[in-house]
From Swiss-Prot:
Its EC number is 2.7.7.6. The lineage of its organism: Eukaryota, Viridiplantae, Streptophyta, Embryophyta, Tracheophyta. DNA-dependent RNA polymerase catalyzes the transcription of DNA into RNA using the four ribonucleoside triphosphates as substrates. Its cofactor is Zn(2+). Zn(2+) binds at C220, C289, C296, C299. One of its GO terms (cellular component) is DNA-directed RNA polymerase complex. In plastids the minimal PEP RNA polymerase catalytic core is composed of four subunits: alpha, beta, beta', and beta''. When a (nuclear-encoded) sigma factor is associated with the core the holoenzyme is formed, which can initiate transcription. It catalyses: RNA(n) + a ribonucleoside 5'-triphosphate = RNA(n+1) + diphosphate. Binds 1 Zn(2+) ion per subunit. PANTHER family: DNA-DIRECTED RNA POLYMERASE SUBUNIT BETA (PTHR34995:SF1). This is DNA-directed RNA polymerase subunit beta''.
Length: 1383
């Protein structure tokens, strides 16, 4: 050793970092040889000591941290309260997830920080502790898993599993924790194998991009540099960045120059810079080097191996590629993995320095209310906000940076160390964030509502995807729906009688719905879907809807016929069909063959002369095919076609034919339609007997004459029963095809006269040209009766005409004269149907009544529920489309009656005295504006009566049971409207709810300053098990009694309670759990108000989902969602876990410029904006150049930072220079745009930026181009050497293209020379290849004005562009361009 050096004796513990510093200082002082000698001695000493004091690792050395218990408990407490808020609808799923991740991450981090002091205090020489900080194996995070907690894990995709592993490996994991843990650990093992090859391939591609970059000059003469400021970055990174670089400018302190341009920076100079806190320092980097395909010594800086400037001929490109690729290989091979443990970041907080009152300037320009990313309310600062905290003896001043969230109110008292603000992590920290979609699925089935307007997503104008403009709740209102399990496929046409056997599958499903199978009978209706004749082969799918009835009803619960959407216009939509039957018939057979079916339009409005009901008389029913014949042809149309008024298209009565005759005839025949391929076993015109085999699996049911016809679709085989007669010459038979001989007109003396008492049908048949014979076929005669006795079906007051409402009875024959009727699969055919047509007189009083309104009413009489159909001539403001938005008439109830119980528009005014002794059933009418419209009832209870309009009737309070306050009573197994066991005081409010129409009544109610839109459903009907059926046009909802809860409001007397309610609850309003309805405490379940009564509220339970702006809502308003359907999708940014196994693909993503994460997307946008604005400001020739330059500079710095971030997070140090060389190659191309045509380059051709710039200068014309980011693979395939490209990928394509274009390879790179066996131009082979060009020295340096200006524009943006624009470009174009190039 050199004796002259004064050696200092240090006594302190040295770690890896200190050793590195020591070695670099030794090299500076003594050079390489001496240093290696010293280090050899250190190595020997280390091995001796390690052998003497060796340590072993045992399970007893793993000491757990004492504070772990309460930390975990605290985190669990926070998670629990978070879960509650989510349940109440205060935070949405993403906020919940994000916050729970941060809570557990913070807990885990805190434990990790506790670990070190804990070891230091209790056992400083613990082997685990020593090992984790020696740098040999393992690090703090791995030891933390052994003694702290494992924490949150990532799944194989790098997503976070939000169930943390609370145990550490010392305590042992539970089963669930073990399975979650296996995700990450398995991932580590697999990654080790797979990623090694990835890292190797990455290295190969990197080297491919930069293999030709060699140091070939000493100085390229550039004046540019990149400024580095010590204030903007941590000291360690600042030192790393500067050491080994070359200054681009002189550095002054005041007037004294402390470093000159082109001086390389050592550790001494860096320390001086840090001490003097110098302004930004400008350094030269590979980015600023002006040479096109190589690099100069000064722009590269010091050689990484020894501390001098890099030598000429050094292959720095290959060194750079290897330096970036190699750590990836090495890192994936580290076996001690963190095992997929999630690492993220926590937000910075500003805490109060002491207790006191906080004050700030509460100005709307400075702060405005917002939600934090965890869903807490906060104030967002738009600029720096000064906050003062006044404690008893001192004032603290704090400044809160812009875009931070203030978590306290003005003048609030804060405690010491309380968090008062959350600092937003700016874009300067390049977290790996990615945009993730999070789907929220419904956990119960029900109906969807939302409480705000929504936008349609622009690309899905007609779909069910909506965007939310502001924060609001989505509600899933509870209720199940009847949907059949099997495919609801039916072959039956409209109005067919259906065979019971064909519906067994649905029947089995239905019976499971009902509580008591014996009482339930079903009738099915399939919707009609027979389209045009062409579509006969493909019948659509239709849903079979159920009509469910129970014994105590007189009307059967209706359901809606659903239609195929494409046949809507032609079908009988908008109808409810309700069969009305007596219960004796119902018990005899499963599907009764007779009975009245009532047809209701969906919106409940009848026009004049529309069909109210129809009746299928079982006497006019036949089981066989045949032909109908009328005796006389006289008939006339009952109804003229009227224009349809309502936009929903109510069907008025179709003009059928009213018979002026009293009988018609039906000629039966047997028809079989067989496919063309089938083999027929009988001949045409042959006679067969009963049960003869006519095809392979078909037998005849009747005997007679066989006719076989071939048709397009198959073979029609008809069997006519009857007698054959060969006519003699005396018999005169007309040559018509068929004659009907009515009964009593045949020959009296004939032998066959006995057979003819019913009449015969004579048909002439000519099998051959010569002979013909006559077939006599039997005829069935149907007499048409006078009609049904109405008194048998309806109460007597219906038939009296004083009500202005009449029922006309019309019989019509379903099939036309002479039309053949075909039966389908053993179903019977109805020949005559009786229509009941609703009509009313146009009195002067009711002249305004264009339509009647039908609704269902459910009435209690002595514990029995009866349902009635009620038809009023009410002109309702809601039903009239012109008056639908009229605020005055907001319900069916008139507003004229002055009564104190007017709580809200849904509350009815007239009340009713009930005297149970006199009447068993009561029904009330609704009053309209005239107060004189009578109403019509179809009631099956004979002892009901109708009450006229009445005023001033006072209501008694009938509820005498003592009800506990704020009790929620579940409605179960009790009878009454909506299943209530108590008598409902105010029936009309409930009644309104039942009869209200499915009109989107959108009222904005001001409730607790919350605007709500709501929609009241049409009506609910309830069966015995407490289910409520809602015949909604879109689906049938079944509400269970479990889904409803009563909520009783306390009341002292009648008047006060009404006033109280009027401020709080209104019908259709949504109430969140924990919200207050009454003064006596919060409500316990979320839901929608169904019924408002004087002292109680019935609430339908609902589940709220909070959604923030930008979320996507799936499904339409009011749509039925099933369990597991997607309700809403959130788009949010989250950071990926920072394991190197994610890190390597990230590096690759950045280098291949794949725009997967939000950052590269932002870069692309930034690039486009720059290009646009700069060209507009500066005009063309400068605009393209400066636009492209600035874009490239921006993106280069950003890319370097991103790649460094990944490696630094793994503790890997790579010098920026290496990354810069790579990034310079992938950003050095520009794309020739198609706008400006140039003579030199093809449109969309990729050329180097410097080449574009020089060509433009030589041609003195503008070339349009824009900056373009290439990935490393594409860069390798876009080089100047086609030999290099061909040896990398796609050999045949590259060579073919090069041959076609006649490309020349100048053999400048290493690879080309290796391939053809020449000398490579690096190291010793460098000297003979490079001829120093003297041309650039001859160009005089023109110290033009332009130089300084352009430099300012490019890098400091200090001055506006006016100065360059104001000068004339064309004075000295060559010089100015040349100078720009030098600069």
């Amino acid at each position: 050793m050199d004796e002259g050096v004064n050696l200092v004796f240090h006594k302190k513990v040295i770690d890896g970092t200190a050793i590195k510093r020591l070695i670099s200082r030794l090299i500076d002082h003594f050079g390489m040889a001496h240093t290696s000698h010293i280090l050899d001695q250190v190595k020997t000493l280390g091995f001796q000591q390690a052998t003497a004091t060796s340590i072993s690792l045992g399970i007893d050395d793993l000491l757990t941290i004492p504070s772990k218990g309460w930390l975990v408990q605290d985190a669990e407490q926070q998670s629990l309260s978070l879960e509650k808020h989510h349940h109440y609808g205060n935070v949405h799923a993403v906020e919940k997830l994000r916050q729970s991740i941060e809570v557990w991450y913070a807990t885990s981090e805190y434990l990790r920080q506790e670990m070190n002091p804990n070891f230091r205090m209790t056992d400083p020489f613990n082997p685990v502790h020593i090992m984790s900080f020696s740098g040999a194996r393992g690090n703090a995070s791995q030891v933390h898993q052994l003694v702290g907690m494992r924490g949150l894990m990532s799944d194989p995709q790098g997503q976070m599993i939000d169930l943390p592993i609370q145990s550490n490996l010392r305590e042992g994991l539970s089963l669930t924790e073990y399975i979650i843990s296996c995700y990450g650990a398995r991932k580590g093992v697999v990654d080790t194998a797979v990623r090694t090859s990835d890292a190797g391939y990455l290295t190969r591609r990197l080297v491919e991009v930069v293999q030709h970059i060699v140091v070939r000059r000493t100085d390229c003469g550039t004046l540019r540099g990149i400024s580095v400021s010590p204030r903007r970055m941590p000291e360690r990174i600042f030192i790393q960045t500067l050491i080994g670089r070359v200054l681009a400018d002189d550095i002054y302190i005041g007037s004294r120059c402390i470093a000159i341009r082109n001086q390389d920076i050592g550790i001494g100079l860096v320390n001086r810079f840090i001490t003097f806190r110098i302004q930004p320092i400008s350094i030269r980097t590979p980015f600023t080097c002006r040479s096109t395909s190589w690099i100069c010594r000064l722009c590269y800086g010091r050689s990484p191996t020894h501390g001098d400037l890099v030598e000429l001929g050094e292959a720095v490109g290959i060194i750079a590629g290897q330096s970036i690729g190699e750590p990836g290989t090495q890192l994936t091979l580290r076996t001690f993995h963190t095992g997929g443990v999630f690492t993220g970041g926590t937000a910075e907080h500003v805490r109060a320095p002491s207790n006191g009152k906080i004050k700030f300037n509460f100005n709307e320009a400075l702060v405005h209310p917002a939600r934090t990313r965890h869903g807490h309310p906060a104030l967002l600062c738009s600029m720096d906000l000064d906050v003062t905290i006044e404690s008893e003896d001192i004032l603290h001043n704090l400044t809160i940076p812009p875009k931070s969230f203030l978590l306290v109110q003005n003048n609030q008292y804060v405690e010491s160390e309380q968090v008062i603000a959350e600092i937003c992590a700016g874009t300067s920290t390049f977290h790996f964030k990615e945009r993730v979609r999070k789907h929220i699925y419904s956990d119960s089935e029900g109906e969807m509502h939302w409480s705000t307007d929504v936008y349609h997503a622009p690309e899905f104008t007609y779909s069910n995807v909506h965007l939310l403009p502001k924060t609001s709740h989505l509600w899933i209102l509870s209720g199940g729906s009847c949907r059949s399990r099997g495919a609801p496929f039916s072959l039956h046409k409209d109005q067919d009688q259906m065979n019971p056997r064909s519906t067994e599958r649905e029947r089995r499903y239905l019976s499971s719905l009902s509580a008591n199978n014996d009482q339930i009978r079903y009738k099915f209706f399939s919707s009609s879907f027979s389209g045009k004749k062409k579509d006969d082969r493909s019948p659509g799918y239709s849903e079979m809807n159920r009509i469910i009835c129970t014994l105590h009803c007189n009307l059967i619960y209706p359901s809606i016929l659903r239609e195929n959407s494409d046949l809507l216009a032609k079908r009988r939509r908008n109808r409810l069909v309700i069969p009305v039957q007596s219960s004796q018939e119902r018990e005899k057979e499963l599907i009764p063959h007779s009975g009245i079916s009532i047809e209701l339009p969906i919106n409940g409005i009848f026009r004049k002369k529309s069909i109210l009901a129809f009746f299928d008389d079982p006497r006019y029913r036949t089981k066989s095919s045949g032909i109908t014949q009328y005796e006389t042809m006289g008939m006339h149309s009952i109804v003229k076609k009227e224009g349809l008024v309502d936009y929903r298209g109510i069907n008025e009565f179709k003009p059928k034919y009213q018979m002026t005759i009293d009988r018609f005839f039906f000629i039966p025949e047997e028809v079989h339609i067989l496919p063309e391929s089938s083999s027929i076993m009988v001949r045409n015109n042959s006679l067969i007997g009963v049960d003869t085999r006519i095809a392979l699996n078909t037998r005849s049911r009747a005997g007679g004459l066989v006719r076989v016809e071939r048709k397009k679709r198959g073979i029609a085989l008809q069997i006519f029963s009857g007698t054959i007669h060969f006519p003699g010459e005396t018999d005169k038979i007309s040559w018509d095809s068929g004659i009907l001989i009515p009964p009593g007109t045949g020959k009296r003396n004939s032998k066959e006269s006995k057979k003819w008492k019913n009449g015969i049908y004579v048909q002439r048949i000519t099998p051959t040209k010569k002979k013909h014979f006559v077939l006599f076929r039997p005829v069935v005669t149907y007499e048409i009766a006078d009609g049904l006795n109405l008194a048998r079906l309806f109460p007597p007051d219906l038939c009296q005409e004083k009500d202005n409402m009449q029922l006309q009875i019309v019989n019509y024959i379903v099939y036309g004269n002479g039309k053949p009727i075909r039966e389908i699969s053993d179903t019977s055919i109805q020949l005559v149907r009786t229509w009941f047509i609703l009509n009313w007189d146009q009195d002067k009083k009711s002249a305004s009544a264009e339509a009647a309104h039908a609704s269902f009413v459910e009435v209690r009489a002595k514990g029995l529920i009866r349902d009635f159909l009620r038809i009023d001539l009410v002109k309702s403001p809601i039903l009239d489309p012109r008056k639908r938005n009229d605020p005055s008439g907001s319900g069916l109830i008139s507003d004229n009656v002055s009564d104190h119980t007017n709580i809200n528009p849904f509350y009815s005014k007239p009340k009713m005295k009930q005297s149970p002794r006199q009447n068993h059933g009561t029904i009330r009418t609704l009053l309209n504006q005239n107060k004189e419209c009578p109403s019509l009832m179809i009631l099956s209870a004979s002892n009901c009566f109708r009450m006229g309009p009445f005023n001033d009737v006072k209501s008694q309070n009938v509820i005498k049971e003592s009800i506990k306050k704020d009790a929620i009573i579940q409605i179960r197994n009790s009878i009454g409207p909506l299943g209530t066991a108590l008598q409902v005081v105010n029936f009309d409010s409930f009644y309104y709810f039942i009869t209200h129409n499915q009109v989107l009544l959108t009222k904005y109610l001001q409730v607790e300053n919350l605007k709500q839109t709501f929609q009241v459903l049409q009506y609910y009907l309830m069966d015995e098990s407490g289910r409520i059926y809602n015949p909604d046009p879109r689906s049938n909802i079944v509400l269970n009694s479990f889904n409803l809860s009563w909520y009783f409001l306390p009341h002292n007397n009648y008047e006060n309670s009404c006033e109280e309610i009027s401020t709080i609850v209104s019908l259709g309003q949504f109430i969140c759990e924990n919200g207050c309805i009454a003064k006596n405490g919060p409500y316990l379940r979320s839901g929608q108000v169904l019924i408002v009564q004087l002292d109680s509220v019935v609430i339908r339970s609902a589940k709220p989902y909070l959604a923030t702006p930008g979320a996507t809502v799936h499904g339409h308003y009011g749509e039925i969602l099933y369990d597991g359907d997607t309700v809403v999708t959130f788009l949010y940014e989250k950071s990926r876990s920072g394991d190197i196994t994610q890190g390597l693909p990230k590096v690759e993503q950045v280098l291949e410029v794949r725009s997967v994460d939000s950052i590269s997307v932002n870069l692309e946008k930034r690039v486009e904006n720059w290009n646009e604005h700069i060209t507009r400001i500066l005009g063309f020739p400068w605009g393209f150049l400066i636009g492209a330059e600035l874009t490239i500079v921006q993106s280069r710095i950003s890319l370097v930072n991103k790649i460094q971030k990944v490696y630094r997070s793994q503790g890997v140090q790579i010098h920026n220079r290496h990354i810069e060389i790579i990034v310079r190659q992938i950003t050095s191309k520009v794309l020739v745009s198609e706008d400006g045509m140039s003579n030199v380059f093809l449109p969309r051709e990729l050329i180097g930026l410097l080449r574009a710039e020089r060509t433009g200068r030589a041609l003195e014309e503008s070339i349009c181009y824009k900056a373009f980011l290439l990935g490393i693979t594409r860069t390798s395939l876009n080089t100047q050497s086609f030999i290099s490209e061909a040896s990398f990928q796609e050999t045949a394509r590259v060579l073919a293209k090069a041959a076609l274009r006649g490309r020349i390879d100048w053999l400048k790179g290493l690879k080309e020379n290796v391939v053809i066996g020449g000398m490579i131009p690096v190291g010793t082979g460098f000297k003979g290849l490079v001829h120093c060009s003297k041309q650039h020295k001859s160009i005089p340096k023109n110290k033009h004005f332009f130089e300084g200006e352009i430099r300012d524009i490019l890098f400091h943006h200090r001055e506006l562009f006016d100065s360059c624009i104001s000068k004339n470009f064309h004075d000295t174009p060559e010089q100015s361009f040349r100078v720009f190039n030098d600069s």
